[in-house]
């Protein structure tokens, strides 16, 4: 289960593996997102609560990871 503050490993587009700390979850489709119990949720104005991101918007979600080389912004598919 993925949480903010976890140490993670990921591979970039050049197949280089990095270790880092997950610092934030972001989305191009939603303003307010969070990582709760390993599930990315967004604030629904309609229901006035956090709900899981819909499959059609999963590609808009990315994660900020702090490494020794700086900050990296990665997709869910890049985690090892």
Enumerate the predicted regions with their spans.
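Short peripheral tails and domain-boundary helices/loops at the edges of structured domains
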Residues: 27-46
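Short coil-to-beta transition motif at edge beta-strands of beta-rich domains
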Residues: 1-13
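Short beta-strand-centered aromatic/proline hotspots
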Residues: 16-28, 37, 53
């Amino acid at each position: 289960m993925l949480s903010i503050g976890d140490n993670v490993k990921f591979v970039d587009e050049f197949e280089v593996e990095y270790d880092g700390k997950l610092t934030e979850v972001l989305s191009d489709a939603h303003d307010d997102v969070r990582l709760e119990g390993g599930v990315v949720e967004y604030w629904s104005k309609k229901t006035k609560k956090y709900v899981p991101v819909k499959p059609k918007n999963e590609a808009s979600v990315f994660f900020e990871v702090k490494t020794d080389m700086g900050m990296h912004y990665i997709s869910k598919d890049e985690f090892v």
